[in-house]
Every structure is written in structure tokens, then in C-alpha cells.
Amino acid sequence: MVLEILARVIKVQLPAYLKRLPVPDSIAGFIRLTVSEWLRLLPFLGVLALLGYLAIRPFLPKKKQQKDSLINLKIQKENPKVVNEIDIEDLRIAKVAYCRCWRSKTFPVCDGSHNKHNELTGDNVGPLILKKKEV
């Protein structure tokens, strides 16, 4: 059933569609096409453009991977790593470090990913450490 439909589209409908297209005999004939004729040509030209792009895409230059950008642009730039430690009385666990570089695989908990980021970019971002306040 599916192959019959596909065969009908390829053998009957596609040739009939191509015969009805208003393709001019010369390049100058494209200037004389009306708006409705251009609209009838648009799907065909779109498919041709897509096929052309897919044909040349393997030969196009690859995009360069963008270098990591700095996260901390101005806070405590004189320190090698910005780490803030906050004492909280109601904290259930003794100490927890939260990520501020957005690169942690265990986000929101810090896993030390900022160290590699800092090496690559020269940044000084570090975690936010919450510590249980000793009463």
C-alpha cells in the first residue's frame, strides 16, 4: 500500500506538478513572471535550495568551538578564587558547597568544575559554601 502510494507520487503526480510549473525559457523570462507564478515556483525552488545546501554541507568549514567566557567580570578580581562562606544556624548538614559557575555535573551542588574553567579562562569563580553555625 505504502509503495503503491509512493510509486503514484513519483510516476504520476510529480511529473504533472513539474509540467504545470511556470518555468520561463530564458533568464529574462523570470523578470516577467507574475506574483502568483512566483508563489507557484516557491516550493520547488525551496526544495532545490535545500538539496543544494545538503550537497555542499560536508564541504563547508566546521564551526570553531567557542572558548569559555568569563563568569565573574568584576567581583574580587584581586583574589585567585572567589569563595564566600556563610554561617547559618538552621542548616541540617554541617557544610555544603553550591555551584556558581553553572558547569557542575551535580548542579546545584559544586563538584569542582570551576577549577578547570578557571584554568582555561583565567577566571576566579568559586563555590558558595554554607556552613552550620556553631552555637
From Swiss-Prot:
Q: What is its main location?
A: endoplasmic reticulum
Ranges in the topological domain labelled Lumenal? 1-37
Residue ranges that the UniProt entry lists as topological domain Cytoplasmic: 61-135
Per its UniProt record, the required cofactor names are: [2Fe-2S] cluster
* One Pfam family in the UniProt entry: MitoNEET_N
Q: Which keywords fit this entry according to its UniProt record?
A: 2Fe-2S, Autophagy, Endoplasmic reticulum, Iron, Iron-sulfur, Membrane, Metal-binding, Mitochondrion, Mitochondrion outer membrane, Transmembrane, Transmembrane helix
Record has Mitochondrion as a keyword: yes
Task: Cite the cofactor comment.
Answer: Binds 1 [2Fe-2S] cluster.
A single GO molecular function, which one? 2 iron, 2 sulfur cluster binding
The record's listing under InterPro entries reads:
CISD1/2 (IPR045131), FeS-contain_CDGSH-typ (IPR018967), FeS-contain_mitoNEET_N (IPR019610), MitoNEET_CISD (IPR042216)
Keyword Endoplasmic reticulum listed = yes
Q: Can you cite an annotated GO cellular component?
A: endoplasmic reticulum membrane
Cellular compartment(s): Endoplasmic reticulum membrane; Mitochondrion outer membrane
Q: Which GO terms describe its biological process?
A: autophagy of mitochondrion; regulation of autophagy
Note the topology in the membrane: Single-pass membrane protein
| Transmembrane spans | 38-60
Positions bound to [2Fe-2S] cluster:
99, 101, 110, 114
| Subunit | Homodimer.
By its UniProt entry, which PANTHER family does this protein fall under?
A: CDGSH IRON-SULFUR DOMAIN-CONTAINING PROTEIN 1, CDGSH IRON-SULFUR DOMAIN-CONTAINING PROTEIN 2
Would you identify the family this protein belongs to, as annotated? Answer: Belongs to the CISD protein family. CISD2 subfamily.
Q: What does this protein do?
A: Regulator of autophagy that contributes to antagonize becn1-mediated cellular autophagy at the endoplasmic reticulum. Participates in the interaction of bcl2 with becn1 and is required for bcl2-mediated depression of endoplasmic reticulum Ca(2+) stores during autophagy.
Identification of the protein by name? CDGSH iron-sulfur domain-containing protein 2
Annotated source species: Aquarana catesbeiana (American bullfrog)
This chain is encoded by the gene named: cisd2
